[in-house]
Each structure stands twice: as structure tokens, then as C-alpha cells.
Regions:
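An anion-binding loop in the catalytic cleft
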Residues: 104-204
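Donor/substrate-binding cores of folate-linked one-carbon enzymes
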Residues: 1-91, 96
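Short, flexible active-site loop motifs that bind/organize anionic cofactors or intermediates
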Residues: 44, 101, 177
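Acyl-group handling in specialized metabolite and lipid biosynthesis
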Residues: 93-106
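Short amphipathic alpha-helical segments
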Residues: 41, 98-100, 167-169
Length: 204
């Protein structure tokens, strides 16, 4: 059972901004993911999809598809479709914790997808004043800034406004090392952020 867009990693489809994912029921083959396909279903990926929510959708869709497919296998009426020898479906790299490190030189849109794709595991993160800051939710802003990527140029009720290589990202739900996950408005009531502070890619 693999994604119809990426083989192996569900999160990657969200990270790369794909519009659909899916589940395939197939025979076991000699090689990795080479067996004939029996049935498949395509699942749309919503603009607010997270890796966790997509996993849940695919798990349910896969279970439903298997229940529908088993009778045809038992009765010998299932139709088998060979996979192309040169599969157009790319194998995604294994998801690691290191993939969650936010590189603010990237565009705000790319980083927003990274945050969604790695929620709930392994989570996107950056470093604020030498401490790990996990980012659980964020949104792309239409604001303009000439600040260096990674610079916090405003922290208010809306969130932590951060300059990116292209565009602005507003962090709306975060978790500082050793603290609970919380909406940014609540976080800022107990943690003062000076405008101009820059997120880093390492601890001090």
C-alpha cells in the first residue's frame, strides 16, 4: 500500500505541495514495490493538510479499499495491472528529524508546507536565543520586508512575523524547548521577543 504520488513517505506529498495522494492494493513482487496492482484510490490533499491528517485519511481509505477488493481476489475475478518497468512514481527519501530544520532562505510557501508535512512527526523547528523552537502551525503573509531571512520583524497577537527568502511567514503555534505547545499569542505573554532577533540553525 503506497501513495499514488510518492512511494513510502506520506509527509513528502504535503511538503512538496502535491494535490493528491492515494492507496494501492497490489500483489507482492520479487523486487521492492514491483507487484501487479489490483485496485487503487486517489485522495485529494487539502490546502491545510498535515502529515498526520493525511495519514489518517489514507489509513481509512486503505482499509475501505481492502474490504472492497478482497471479495474479487477470493472469487478470482480481480483484474491485475502491471506497473510500468520505468515507474514514473519517485521514491521519497526517508523522513528524518533533521529535515525539520527550517531554512528561512527558502520561500514562505515552502516552509509553510514543511511545517504541515512534518506535523505531528518529526515537527519543523528552528532555534530562538539558543533554544529549540518547534513550529506547529504557521501561515504565509502578504507583508513585504527587506529584512534578512530568519529575522523576526514583528511579534504580535497574529503571530511571529518572520522574513523568508521569498515572502513572510507568520508562526501561529509554537513550542519552546521544555515548554508546552501553545498558540503564539499565549506564548508571547510569557516570552518577550525583541524585533530584529534572527532565528538560527543551531544552539548557542
Amino acid at each position: 500500500a503506497a501513495s499514488d504520488v510518492y512511494k513510502r513517505q506520506i509527509q513528502q506529498a504535503v511538503i512538496d505541495g502535491e494535490k493528491v495522494s492515494g492507496v494501492t492494493i497490489q500483489q507482492m513482487g520479487e523486487g521492492l514495490d514491483t507487484g501487479d496492482m489490483i485496485s487503487k484510490i486517489v485522495i485529494p490533499i487539502s490546502p491545510t493538510e498535515t502529515g498526520g491528517s493525511l495519514f489518517g485519511k489514507l489509513a481509512q481509505a486503505g482499509a475501505d479499499l481492502l474490504i472492497k477488493t478482497l471479495p474479487s481476489i477470493e472469487q478470482g475475478t480481480a483484474e491485475f495491472e502491471k506497473q510500468p518497468e520505468e515507474s514514473p512514481t519517485p521514491y521519497a527519501a526517508m523522513i528524518t528529524k533533521q529535515m525539520g530544520l527550517m531554512d528561512f532562505r527558502k520561500s514562505a510557501e515552502e516552509l509553510e508546507r514543511l511545517v504541515r508535512g512534518l506535523n505531528p512527526w518529526p515537527s519543523a523547528y528552528t532555534f530562538l536565543n539558543g533554544k529549540t523552537l518547534k513550529v506547529w502551525k504557521c501561515k504565509v503573509s502578504t507583508e513585504k520586508t527587506d529584512a534578512v531571512p530568519g529575522t523576526i520583524f514583528l511579534a504580535d497577537k497574529e503571530g511571529i512575523h518572520t522574513a523568508c527568502g521569498e515572502g513572510v511567514l507568520i508562526l501561529t503555534e509554537v513550542q519552546l524547548e521544555g515548554k508546552k505547545r501553545m498558540e503564539t499569542e499565549a506564548f508571547l505573554r510569557g516570552y518577550h521577543i525583541e524585533n530584529g532577533i534572527v532565528f538560527t540553525d543551531h544552539k548557542e
